[in-house]
């Protein structure tokens, strides 16, 4: 059967969710005994058998990633910037004492997880994407606050749409909760950075806000990031456009934000990565939130309740701002293969079955070569002994 297979029939691609049936996920294990990660295994059961005393449950020892895959016009499937995500997972893992998943292994596991579920990658002209969720965590019966003897790395996939949709959002600055402390774990994608904000995000939604924004916890005078995505501001002065991105070690290094900056530079725009003072919110022509799940969405307004400040932007007219629209269109066109990917972001998914067969042949050839070389060596030693 040709790879990749066509999209599965009978799915409403506009209404897919994490409950969409998938064929399975990929697993690798690390043990202290071997000191390395095992060969990837494709597992059909979506449920994990993990000891109840595993550190992931009690100490939050886990890190994760989020990538996406799209189908191009020719039917090929591409994963967006998997190398960047691999390096980011290594960084996140280092913050919570998890052995790094080598980049090559990460890429192989992502390719296998996507390739084995290729039929649920949406059609090229459909809304949505295949969302890829790598996760690594400490496991096994382990109560001590020390590195355990075993870790599990998994790559799951599911169908998904844009997290916030495409309409401009109303943002609320959180003032009663600090996302991350200086010199803390704010730069990592670890669970402890996200679950505490859930109750605040839910309260904000009840109050009529779509997304929450964080100031720095030390001085509360600088913009850091949205709870789900990176912050990008735009100054527009006629034909001159400047994007401003907060430069702080307390936020996650956003893959999409990095892509947006590269796109902006290719368009001749100026990009400034620096500290962004709260007072500067009133000066931006546009504000955007960008991330893997949200892609790029305009911010309609930003509210700070304690000061009664409310900043309105060009997108207040219920349409995406012009800068956001241009960048978003370019991103999606590159992701879906409509225009040339001059940045090399999109990596083609290979048939995992063919790759496994090829690897098996290569391994066998290496073993034969090794055996032959050892045989020659033993033969030479025998000749020397006879002489």
UniProtKB/Swiss-Prot annotation:
N6-(pyridoxal phosphate)lysine: modified positions: 189
Binding site for pyridoxal 5'-phosphate: 88, 225
SUPFAM superfamilies, per database record: D-aminoacid aminotransferase-like PLP-dependent enzymes
Gene name, Swiss-Prot/TrEMBL: lcsP
Active site, renumbered: 189 (proton acceptor)
Gene source species: Purpureocillium lilacinum (Paecilomyces lilacinus)
Function of the protein: Aminotransferase; part of the gene cluster that mediates the biosynthesis of the lipopeptide antibiotics leucinostatins that show extensive biological activities, including antimalarial, antiviral, antibacterial, antifungal, and antitumor activities, as well as phytotoxic.
Needed cofactors: pyridoxal 5'-phosphate
Family, as annotated: Belongs to the class-IV pyridoxal-phosphate-dependent aminotransferase family.
Name of this protein: Aminotransferase lcsP
UniProt-listed Pfam families: Aminotran_4
EC number: 2.6.1.-
Factors inducing expression: Expression is negatively regulated by the leucinostatins biosynthesis cluster-specific transcription regulator lcsF.
Alphabetical keyword list: Aminotransferase, Pyridoxal phosphate, Transferase
Pathways per UniProt: Secondary metabolite biosynthesis
GO molecular function: branched-chain-amino-acid transaminase activity
Binding site for substrate: 64
């Amino acid at each position: 059967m040709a790879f990749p297979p066509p999209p599965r029939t009978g799915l409403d691609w506009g209404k897919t969710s994490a409950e969409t049936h998938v064929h399975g996920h990929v697993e690798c294990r690390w043990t202290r005994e071997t000191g390395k990660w095992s060969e990837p295994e494709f597992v059909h059961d979506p449920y994990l058998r993990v000891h109840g005393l595993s550190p992931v449950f009690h100490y939050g020892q886990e890190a994760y990633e989020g990538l996406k895959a799209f189908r191009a016009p020719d039917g090929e499937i591409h994963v967006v910037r998997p190398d960047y995500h691999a390096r980011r997972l290594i960084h996140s893992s280092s913050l919570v004492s998890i052995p790094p998943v080598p980049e090559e292994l990460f890429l192989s596991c992502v390719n296998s997880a996507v390739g084995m579920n290729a039929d649920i990658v949406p059609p090229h002209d459909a809304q949505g994407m295949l969302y890829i969720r790598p996760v690594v965590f400490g496991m096994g019966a382990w109560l001590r606050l020390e590195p355990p003897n075993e870790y599990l790395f998994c790559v799951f996939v599911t169908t998904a749409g844009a997290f916030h949709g495409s309409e401009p959002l109303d943002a609320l600055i959180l003032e009663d909760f600090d996302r991350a402390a200086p010199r803390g774990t704010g730069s990592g994608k670890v669970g402890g950075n996200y679950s505490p904000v859930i109750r605040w995000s839910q309260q904000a939604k009840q109050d009529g806000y779509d997304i929450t924004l964080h100031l720095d916890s030390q001085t509360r005078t600088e913009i850091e990031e949205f709870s789900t995505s990176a912050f990008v501001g735009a100054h527009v002065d006629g034909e001159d456009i400047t994007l401003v991105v907060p430069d702080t070690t307390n936020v996650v290094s956003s893959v999409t934000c990095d892509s947006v900056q590269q796109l902006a530079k290719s368009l001749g725009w100026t990009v400034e990565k620096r500290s962004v003072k709260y007072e500067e919110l009133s000066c931006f022509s546009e504000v955007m939130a960008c991330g893997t799940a949200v892609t790029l969405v305009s911010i309609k307004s930003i509210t700070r309740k304690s000061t009664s400040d409310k900043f309105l932007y060009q997108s207040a007219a219920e349409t995406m701002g012009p800068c956001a629209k241009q960048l978003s269109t370019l991103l999606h066109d590159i992701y879906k293969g409509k225009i040339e990917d001059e940045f090399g972001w999109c990596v083609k998914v290979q048939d995992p079955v063919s790759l496994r067969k090829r690897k098996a042949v290569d391994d066998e050839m290496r073993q034969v070569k090794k055996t032959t070389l050892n045989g020659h060596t033993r033969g030479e030693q025998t000749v020397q002994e006879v002489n």
